[in-house]
Curated annotation (Swiss-Prot):
Homodimer. This is Transcription factor bHLH34. GO terms for molecular function: DNA-binding transcription factor activity; protein dimerization activity; sequence-specific DNA binding; transcription cis-regulatory region binding. InterPro entries: bHLH_dom (IPR011598), HLH_DNA-bd_sf (IPR036638), ILR3-like (IPR044818). Keywords: DNA-binding, Nucleus, Transcription, Transcription regulation. It comes from the Eukaryota. The keyword Manganese does not apply. Its main location: nucleus. It is found in: Nucleus. The lineage of its organism: Eukaryota, Viridiplantae, Streptophyta, Embryophyta, Tracheophyta. One of its GO terms (cellular component) is nucleus. PROSITE patterns: BHLH.
């Protein structure tokens, strides 16, 4: 029932009994009489079953009071409370202040030395089974504020991000960049006015301007298409005119060649006339048909309209 004690110099018996099932401890009262079996030790029955709301996964903070020390005045026996490290097993870290009742975690150690002094056995960096850490340098208010900041869904309204790597800081930087973009967009849409702060109004103006520019671009595309068609038609007319010009140029060259082929006498040239006295005894010179002397000028042929005699009665008077 009791753990074996091998060290006789420093006797330590954490005599804690589980009374949650209703079993009575025969040593449930303080045994300080000399006639008892264990003359130098006392026992105390405790309830080791923790309520559901008092169980924590981890703890990290200030432990204000875990066990209270007391002094018994029977024969100079001094009792000091110590932490039952075998009764609790907490892990990881917990931000907050743990309020723990003393009668649920305390064991007792008795000594027969009259000069003994009440002593609270507590390790600085380790309280429960070497797992729970106590930070005595931080205040309760700072721990509570940190706990509320981490557990609550609200963000702290600070001017600058204390932790650039946190999600709240990244979100704040993203929102600031987005607001700057909206301000730039408002300045571009209305250069002469003060930038708007209403994001919905800025988006409405942007949609209106985009639709207007899209309509103007469509009209310009149609106008450009019409101009391209006109350019094509003008190019075709230009090619036709160029062909006609070439034809006219060829006709002009042909006519010039015909004119050059006709011999035209100079105005100072006159045919030599021989007087009849010198040729009276001679016969007239007869030329064959179709032969013309080389120096004799030629008459140009009459046009067909002048050679037409069907309209002579109308054009000429009958007397003639």
């Amino acid at each position: 029932m009791y753990p074996s004690i091998e060290d006789d110099d420093d006797l330590l018996a954490a005599l804690c009994f589980d009374q949650s099932n209703g079993v009575e401890d025969p040593y449930g009262y303080m045994q300080t009489n000399e006639d008892n079996i264990f003359q130098d030790f006392g026992s105390c029955g405790v309830n080791l079953m923790q309520p559901q709301q008092e169980q924590f996964d981890s703890f990290n903070g200030n432990l204000e009071q875990v066990c209270s020390s007391f002094r018994g005045g029977n024969n100079g026996v001094v009792y000091s409370s110590s932490i039952g490290s075998a009764q609790l097993d907490l892990a990881a870290s917990f931000s907050g202040v743990l309020q723990q009742e003393t009668h649920q975690v305390c064991g007792f150690r008795g000594q027969n030395d009259d000069s003994a002094v009440p002593h609270l056995q507590q390790q600085q960096g380790q309280v429960f089974s070497g797992v729970v850490e106590i930070n005595s340098s931080s205040s309760v208010g700072a721990v509570k504020e940190e706990f509320e900041e981490e557990c609550s869904g609200k963000r702290r309204r600070t001017g600058s991000c204390s932790k650039p790597g946190t999600k709240a800081c990244r979100e704040k930087l993203r929102r600031e960049k987005l607001n700057d973009k909206f301000m730039d967009l408002s300045s571009v849409l209305e250069p002469g006015r003060t930038p708007k702060t209403d994001k919905s109004a800025i988006l409405d103006d942007a949609i209106r301007v985009v639709n207007q520019l899209r309509g103007e671009a469509h009209e310009l595309q149609e106008t450009n298409q019409k101009l391209l068609e006109e350019i094509k038609s003008l190019k075709a007319d230009k090619n036709e005119l160029r062909e006609e010009k070439l034809v006219l140029k060829a006709e002009k060259e042909k006519m010039e060649q015909q004119l050059k082929s006709m011999v035209v006498p100079s105005p100072g040239f006159m045919p030599s006339q021989h007087p009849a006295a010198f040729h009276s005894h001679k016969m007239a010179v007869a030329y064959p048909y179709g032969y013309y002397p080389p120096n004799m000028p030629m008459w140009s042929p009459l046009p067909p309209a002048d050679r037409d005699t069907s309209r002579d009665l109308k054009n000429l008077p009958p007397v003639a």
